[in-house]
Amino acid sequence: MLLELARWLQQLESLFGLFNYLTFRGILAALTALFLSLWMGPAVIRKLAQFKGGQPIRQDGPQTHFSKAGTPTMGGSLILLTVTLSVLLWGDLRNRYVWLVLAVMICFGAIGWYDDWIKIVKRDPNGLKSRWKYLLQSIFGLAAGLFLYYTADVPAAITFYIPMFKSIALPLAGVSFVVIAYFWIVGFSNAVNLTDGLDGLAIMPTVLVACALGVFAYASGNVVFAEYLKIPLIPGAGELIIICSAIAGAGLGFLWFNTYPAMVFMGDIGALSLGAVLGTIAVIVRQEMVLVIMGGVFVIETLSVMIQVVSFKLTGKRVFRMAPIHHHFELKGWPEPRVIVRFWIISVVLVLIGLATLKVR
């Protein structure tokens, strides 16, 4: 929105040419989302607190979590609102990738909102039935994959790349591309949701991964950097740095209220949508495998649930004291802040490894 105004004003004053730089608008997007979150946060939390009862607490969970009863949930609505406003202000609204990612965020956020609504109104900790949740996620995930496939304007946009082996490029047919896109979008949507079980645990890795994906998006959309780093050149992908920056700013603003002990929980409205956005951006910039590395905390949390379920069904025994794995460490006696910060540290390391793949050939 403001980019179009700046382009017109540039004819009168060259200073407005700054808005043509992605990095400049990315910084403004992050700051806008951050300050909007800090400004709107208290009012949003008060409004959410009017839903009496707050987030239901699992009866089989750690005993320390019962003190969280009544804490407002659906705080992810603050993230979605500030990200959307920031992107509409600073993004190039002629870019199809911007609209796709916003659409994915809103659609998955709607699923999460309904899930949270059931938990709060009906006092059902399980929320929306899994089959309906996965059905809706599948519809939106497949729709995003189909859109990306049929709007691809360069072969690189539908080619599978393996980090550190940049000479290996696997062209994807329609079905295989859409299936991969589906699994990454829906998979990371649920992975972030599983991780969101402790105060601030999910949002900080999300911020870190979003920042790193912003670097990949910027490089992928730049002819010089893409050629130098030997990564796929995806015209228009650079604009995604605006969305990544907005997520980083909104996430830090939300963390201000979500840090231990949390004043508000993100809820499924935030976790499902943010995970889907990370997966979508990774698919667009053709860095699916790098996302698996950088989002390793989300992957580990998901694998712990899968291992727990399979082990119990096959042997009747549980591998972990409780899944996802962050609850396992809680039940081992780790204080909640220790679990959170250590998972953050792991996330920092994994993101740095992911960024290092830019130079490894």
Curated annotation (Swiss-Prot):
<feature type="transmembrane region" description="Helical">
    <location>
        <begin position="139"/>
        <end position="159"/>
    </location>
</feature>
<dbReference type="GO" id="GO:0071555">
    <property type="term" value="P:cell wall organization"/>
</dbReference>
<keyword id="KW-1003">Cell membrane</keyword>
<feature type="transmembrane region" description="Helical">
    <location>
        <begin position="73"/>
        <end position="93"/>
    </location>
</feature>
<feature type="transmembrane region" description="Helical">
    <location>
        <begin position="200"/>
        <end position="220"/>
    </location>
</feature>
<keyword id="KW-0132">Cell division</keyword>
<dbReference type="GO" id="GO:0051992">
    <property type="term" value="F:UDP-N-acetylmuramoyl-L-alanyl-D-glutamyl-meso-2,6-diaminopimelyl-D-alanyl-D-alanine:undecaprenyl-phosphate transferase activity"/>
</dbReference>
<dbReference type="InterPro" id="IPR000715">
    <property type="entry name" value="Glycosyl_transferase_4"/>
</dbReference>
<protein>
    <recommendedName>
        <fullName>Phospho-N-acetylmuramoyl-pentapeptide-transferase</fullName>
        <ecNumber>2.7.8.13</ecNumber>
    </recommendedName>
</protein>
<keyword id="KW-0133">Cell shape</keyword>
<dbReference type="GO" id="GO:0008360">
    <property type="term" value="P:regulation of cell shape"/>
</dbReference>
<keyword id="KW-0460">Magnesium</keyword>
<feature type="transmembrane region" description="Helical">
    <location>
        <begin position="98"/>
        <end position="118"/>
    </location>
</feature>
<dbReference type="Pfam" id="PF00953">
    <property type="entry name" value="Glycos_transf_4"/>
</dbReference>
<comment type="pathway">
    <text>Cell wall biogenesis; peptidoglycan biosynthesis.</text>
</comment>
<feature type="transmembrane region" description="Helical">
    <location>
        <begin position="264"/>
        <end position="284"/>
    </location>
</feature>
<feature type="transmembrane region" description="Helical">
    <location>
        <begin position="290"/>
        <end position="310"/>
    </location>
</feature>
<dbReference type="InterPro" id="IPR003524">
    <property type="entry name" value="PNAcMuramoyl-5peptid_Trfase"/>
</dbReference>
<keyword id="KW-0131">Cell cycle</keyword>
<keyword id="KW-0472">Membrane</keyword>
<keyword id="KW-0997">Cell inner membrane</keyword>
<feature type="transmembrane region" description="Helical">
    <location>
        <begin position="25"/>
        <end position="45"/>
    </location>
</feature>
<keyword id="KW-0573">Peptidoglycan synthesis</keyword>
<dbReference type="InterPro" id="IPR018480">
    <property type="entry name" value="PNAcMuramoyl-5peptid_Trfase_CS"/>
</dbReference>
<dbReference type="GO" id="GO:0051301">
    <property type="term" value="P:cell division"/>
</dbReference>
<dbReference type="GO" id="GO:0005886">
    <property type="term" value="C:plasma membrane"/>
</dbReference>
<feature type="transmembrane region" description="Helical">
    <location>
        <begin position="339"/>
        <end position="359"/>
    </location>
</feature>
<dbReference type="GO" id="GO:0009252">
    <property type="term" value="P:peptidoglycan biosynthetic process"/>
</dbReference>
<keyword id="KW-0808">Transferase</keyword>
<comment type="similarity">
    <text>Belongs to the glycosyltransferase 4 family. MraY subfamily.</text>
</comment>
<feature type="transmembrane region" description="Helical">
    <location>
        <begin position="237"/>
        <end position="257"/>
    </location>
</feature>
<keyword id="KW-0961">Cell wall biogenesis/degradation</keyword>
<feature type="transmembrane region" description="Helical">
    <location>
        <begin position="168"/>
        <end position="188"/>
    </location>
</feature>
<keyword id="KW-0812">Transmembrane</keyword>
<dbReference type="GO" id="GO:0008963">
    <property type="term" value="F:phospho-N-acetylmuramoyl-pentapeptide-transferase activity"/>
</dbReference>
<comment type="function">
    <text>Catalyzes the initial step of the lipid cycle reactions in the biosynthesis of the cell wall peptidoglycan: transfers peptidoglycan precursor phospho-MurNAc-pentapeptide from UDP-MurNAc-pentapeptide onto the lipid carrier undecaprenyl phosphate, yielding undecaprenyl-pyrophosphoryl-MurNAc-pentapeptide, known as lipid I.</text>
</comment>
<keyword id="KW-0479">Metal-binding</keyword>
<dbReference type="GO" id="GO:0046872">
    <property type="term" value="F:metal ion binding"/>
</dbReference>
<keyword id="KW-1133">Transmembrane helix</keyword>
